[in-house]
């Protein structure tokens, strides 16, 4: 779809021309899962599948939002709120609007002048609950539209922080900053090596040669805010609290494996030990993956990606039958260097690094196994690594 098509869709809904069209990407994370809120390292990139938004200013103080994605539902409607309303939408069919509303609320709280309403038409191509950061894509889309329309003097990293605040405080999910950072700071053909504790980062070319990344969606929805995601955050915080009987740390990402092994006895709970062990070992795997990328050692990268999935399955327990079926059967396919779940888990998506010449057979074989075992189809996506949010 092109810019004119989105403008035409906006006009169909709001009966007047739209002003501008923006795109905000989704993201995948090559490695470093559930490490962001633990103060560790991650290695994500922005992808060409994302969210498009068309907006047009209004003369009153009403914000009116329409989603083409909810148009498939019988109760599709334009949802409205006032720019001075600071409370989350509570109706079940309106909660998705809070990702937009939170950004507006927190920008106004920061003292930015947002003095009129607007209409907003949304068309997302990231399946909701796919683990590809549809929520961060929406937050950064909204932030960049507001920045453009109201000439806000704010840089992208500050918008990223407000995106995380929206997720944490307005929506109620205790996530780290990786998703918003990956989306907001995306750079074409590069992944971002990010220290989530300090926000120090560097771009690394995602040079895979004869290989490509294939996204595999379980087509099973996950709702992180209603899942065990927040429980994992709390378990890691409790592990830190127990380790601090002898140590002085704020996050598990501050530990290496040797130090963790030395003081594991302080945690004194098998479940908490496994949760913390994942956070520490995944952080180390991410650092090793960067070394492998810089040396061009894709086979080592693949091994680390596989080990990440194993840790997420057994120590962190966030995979599930669908994700395990995709990742573990991907491992057995010709030309696959590595595969693992991505995102929060509990369904959603996995990624695989696959030889380009084997890609079609890979999709066919893994797809058949998944359908036979799970009972419905998985979806497979090829995505390019792209820049962050921008105006078309």
UniProtKB/Swiss-Prot annotation:
Pfam families (UniProt xref): GalKase_gal_bdg (PF10509), GHMP_kinases_C (PF08544), GHMP_kinases_N (PF00288)
Catalytic reaction(s) noted: alpha-D-galactose + ATP = alpha-D-galactose 1-phosphate + ADP + H(+)
Site description Transition state stabilizer, residues in chain: 27
Top-level taxon of origin: Bacteria
Residues forming the catalytic site: 179
Gene Ontology biological process: galactose metabolic process
SUPFAM superfamilies: GHMP Kinase, C-terminal domain, Ribosomal protein S5 domain 2-like
Chief localization: cytoplasm
Binding site for ATP: 67, 129-135
Protein's UniProt keywords contain Magnesium: yes
Residues holding Mg(2+): 135, 167
Keyword annotations from UniProtKB, A to Z: ATP-binding, Carbohydrate metabolism, Cytoplasm, Galactose metabolism, Kinase, Magnesium, Metal-binding, Nucleotide-binding, Transferase
Entries under InterPro entries matching the protein: Galactokinase, Galactokinase_bac, Galactokinase_CS, GalKase_N, GHMP_kinase_C_dom, GHMP_kinase_C_sf, GHMP_kinase_N_dom, GHMP_knse_ATP-bd_CS
Pathway note: Carbohydrate metabolism; galactose metabolism
Transmembrane segments: none
Amino-acid positions noted as binding substrate in the UniProt annotation, renumbered to this chain: 33-36, 229
Subcellular location: Cytoplasm
Family to which this protein belongs: Belongs to the GHMP kinase family. GalK subfamily.
Role this protein plays: Catalyzes the transfer of the gamma-phosphate of ATP to D-galactose to form alpha-D-galactose-1-phosphate (Gal-1-P).
Protein's UniProt name: Galactokinase
């Amino acid at each position: 779809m092109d810019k004119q098509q989105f403008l035409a869709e906006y006009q169909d809904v709001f009966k007047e021309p739209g002003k501008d069209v923006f795109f905000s990407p989704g993201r995948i994370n090559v490695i470093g899962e559930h490490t962001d809120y633990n103060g560790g390292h991650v290695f994500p990139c922005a992808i060409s599948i994302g969210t498009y938004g068309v907006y047009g200013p209004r003369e009153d103080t009403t914000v009116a939002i329409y989603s083409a994605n909810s148009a498939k539902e019988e109760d599709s409607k334009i949802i409205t709120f006032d720019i001075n309303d600071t409370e989350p939408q509570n109706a079940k069919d309106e909660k998705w609007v809070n990702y937009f509303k939170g950004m507006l609320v927190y920008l106004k709280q920061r003292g930015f002048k947002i003095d009129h309403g607007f209409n907003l038409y949304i068309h997302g191509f990231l399946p909701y609950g796919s683990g590809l950061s549809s929520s961060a894509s929406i937050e950064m889309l909204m932030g960049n539209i507001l920045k453009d329309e109201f000439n806000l003097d704010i840089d992208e990293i500050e918008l990223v922080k407000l995106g995380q605040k929206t997720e944490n405080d307005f929506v109620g999910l205790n996530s780290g900053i990786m998703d918003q950072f990956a989306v907001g700071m995306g750079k074409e053909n590069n992944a971002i090596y990010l220290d989530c504790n300090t926000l120090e980062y560097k771009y690394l070319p995602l040079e895979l040669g004869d290989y490509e990344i294939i996204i595999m969606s379980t087509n099973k929805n996950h709702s992180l805010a209603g899942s065990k995601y927040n429980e994992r955050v709390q378990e890691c915080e409790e592990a830190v609290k127990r380790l601090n009987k002898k140590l002085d740390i704020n996050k598990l990402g501050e530990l290496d494996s040797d130090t963790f092994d030395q003081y594991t006895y302080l945690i004194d709970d098998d479940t908490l030990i496994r949760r913390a062990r994942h956070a520490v070992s995944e952080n180390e795997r991410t650092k090793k993956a960067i070394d492998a990328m810089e040396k061009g050692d894709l086979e080592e990268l693949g091994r680390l990606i596989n080990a990440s999935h194993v840790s997420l399955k057994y120590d962190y327990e966030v995979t599930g039958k669908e994700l395990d079926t995709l990742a573990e059967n991907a491992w057995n396919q010709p030309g696959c260097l590595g595969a693992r779940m991505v995102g929060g888990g509990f369904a959603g998506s996995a990624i695989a690094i696959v030889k380009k010449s084997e890609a079609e057979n890979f999709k066919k074989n893994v797809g058949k196994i998944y359908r036979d075992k799970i009972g419905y189809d998985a979806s497979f996506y090829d995505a390019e690594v792209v820049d962050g949010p921008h105006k078309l």
